[in-house]
Amino acid sequence: MKIFFKFLCLFLLFGCSETTFLINSAKRIGSWGDEPIYKVGNPYKINGKWYYPAVDYQYDEVGIASWYGPGFHGKTTANGEVFDQNKISAAHRTLPMPSVVKVTNLENGLVLEKVRINDRGPFARNRIIDLSKKAAEELGFIKNGVAKVRVEILEDESRKYV
């Protein structure tokens, strides 16, 4: 009986330690909700064109921005978050998710100091970033639909997610 009792105690002890390990692992991995999931991503092909996601802390590009919202509101983004068109966020074809960028509207001088990349896109020709409806409103191009912008990665803010 003593041997059985010792075996039972050891079994329960090891069972508890495994449960603790799994709980701690889940905390480190994060969740789909409040804490964003970091991922660079694998190469992918859209409409016959290959895209190669990569870490690029020197990213600085001028081009056309567009915005997206109603058709995607409430749907899951490429990194697993729920898209909210009323929050400032963006889609980019190759930057890690999440990354933080500064976006300047070169047509009117308005600036968004911090925009978090949490989705993939745009896949329309000649566009370098797709902004949420809220971000487009803040940058003053909601009615035009597109604007010439400068997108600069913010290295320190982006590294916080790694």
What is the predicted function of each stretch?
Residues 2-10:
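Sec-dependent signal peptide recognition
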Residues 1-2, 64:
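Short linear, low-complexity motifs centered on an aromatic residue
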